[in-house]
Amino acid sequence: MLSSYFAPGSIVLQDVSPSFEAAVAQSVSLLVGSGKANPEYVDEVLETLRVLGPYFAIAPGLALAHAKPSAAVMEPGMALLKLTEPVNSGSANDPISLIFSMCSPNVSDHLEMLGDFGELMSTEKVMNSLLNASAQSVISEILFKKAL
């Protein structure tokens, strides 16, 4: 279940970020702060962004920042940085205000997390609710399926 991947403090609302790369770094840093990954994982995700471009921007307003399963990851984890002022990633899905980050130590966890995330985010109601949410508690309720 998706909720088991989020640690306390891994959902943050923020007004602005100077760039998409900075927002990605901040979102992934939430995984480091929660003990799910080492600081090296931030570098791995940013390198993925530099090499592959803004493929993290997977839907209008939504990005899922991640790297391949890594030794820099201690346990599966997810985090979310929601920006009040969206940033441009350089993709057709701009502007981006929801920057999820994901980490996994192995392929099976990685695929399971992607499936859980895709299942939740596949409904327009969830997407719109997250995009319009203005409080951390509301976002938590949406993600953990209490408000839907």
Regions found by a protein language model. Name each.
Residues 1-148:
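Cytosolic covalent-transfer regions centered on His/Cys nucleophiles
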